[in-house]
Regions:
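The feature captures the beta-strand-to-loop junction immediately N-terminal to the Walker
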Residues: 37-39
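ABC ATPase nucleotide-binding domains
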Residues: 33, 72-234
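Helix-to-loop junction immediately C-terminal to a conserved catalytic motif
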Residues: 52
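Conserved ABC transporter NBD signature motif
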Residues: 60-68
Length: 360
């Protein structure tokens, strides 16, 4: 059974010679919390605006619930959008901000009152009806913007970096609230962000974008554990890259030569071709072990600690070995400045924790 609710079919959007979105195709399921993630200028907001109807594609088409919406104006689409700057009218109170636009739907006063009360309860703003924008905190303004978008009962809510203006603690709180809200009301959310942690903590699936293209579309766990290329591995979390070349295939493994470390059998999850130098090995910091003594792990390197950063729940180490100029690893075990004599240490890696990636 195909539950595809939104279908993006070979969509491109050009601004002059700039390909903001370049031949993108994917599907979003009904009731899904779906994120578009990428750096500034990657095309994620343009793609969201194409879904909203604020931009029209150069080529390709968009289907929503089986209906072609490619040429429909924004007010004819079953979507609504929440902006980063909230776009709250300062001269009218919360209740009238949320009511704005409902009159055009031909609703009675009683229907409008019920919808507004319901959505105020949904976003936890009961009692704030008479307040103005200047009397609200950042989080409350965000809730007003959400309420105004949801009161029209869209099939899809589009969110353009809605938490970007909030401080970290409030942003973390709003992430949890947004996720809970989406699950409670059950509609499809399409969420744009440049914040990796935000995307992987909230989403059912994430599309990672770069230069107008989808680099990988997967669950958060799959993106982190099995990135498809060097861009995704580097953009999602933190990693160590080691230069490598592939040799011969050996079942599900491939013989790979890691620069200055030797030749090893690495699991070839991406079916990377033999005899290729266009590859790297990626090792996540938390999969490595730092210790005062040599281990029996597959790879064990003697190194020197160059810098440490205490992060509360963990300590981050920047280490130099004779084979590798800089390695980053983390440990949940507390180490002070006296833990390692002369800053000497051993770094251990298991081969199962090494991902072989294409550079592109």
């Amino acid at each position: 059974m195909n539950n595809s609710f939104i279908q993006i079919n070979q969509i491109s959007k050009h601004f002059g010679d700039v390909k903001a979105v370049d031949n993108v195709s994917f599907e979003i399921q009904e009731g899904e919390f779906f994120s578009l993630l990428g750096p500034s200028g990657c095309g994620k907001t343009t793609l969201l605006r194409l879904l909203a109807g604020f931009e029209y594609p150069t080529s390709g088409n968009l289907l929503l619930d089986g209906i072609d919406i490619t040429a429909l104006p924004p007010d004819k689409r079953p979507t609504n959008m929440v902006f980063q700057n909230y776009a709250i009218f300062p001269h009218i109170n919360v209740q009238r901000n949320i009511q704005f636009g409902l009159r055009k739907l031909g609703l009675t006063n009683e229907e409008i009152r019920k919808r507004v009360n319901d959505v105020l309860s949904l976003v936890k703003l009961e009692g704030y009806e008479e307040r103005f924008n200047s009397q609200l905190s950042g989080g409350q303004r965000q809730r007003v913007a959400l309420a105004r978008a949801l009161v029209r009962q869209p099939k899809v809510l589009l969110l353009d970096e809605p938490l970007g203006a909030l401080d970290k603690k409030l942003r973390d709180e709003m992430q949890l609230e947004l996720r809970t809200l989406q699950k409670n009301i059950g509609i499809t959310f399409v969420f744009v962000t440049h914040d990796q942690q935000e995307a992987i903590s909230m989403s059912d699936r994430v599309a990672v974008m770069s230069e107008g293209k989808i680099q990988q579309l997967s669950t958060p766990n799959e993106l982190y554990k099995n990135p498809h290329n060097i861009f995704v591995s580097d953009f999602i979390g933190e990693t160590n890259f080691l230069k490598a070349e592939t040799k011969s295939q050996d079942g599900e493994y491939i013989n790979a030569s890691i620069e200055k470390l030797g030749e090893f059998k690495i699991k070839n999850n991406l079916n990377i071709s033999e005899n290729s130098s266009d590859v790297v090995c990626s090792v996540r910091p938390e999969t490595m072990m730092i210790d005062k003594e040599k281990s029996d792990w597959d790879i064990c390197l003697e190194g020197k600690i160059k810098q440490t950063s205490y992060l509360g729940e963990m300590t981050k180490f920047y280490i130099e070995t004779k084979e590798i100029e800089k390695i980053i690893t983390v440990s949940s075990q507390y180490f002070d400045n006296q833990s390692f004599k002369n800053n000497d240490c051993f770094i251990s890696i298991n081969l199962d924790d090494i991902s072989l990636l294409n550079k592109k």
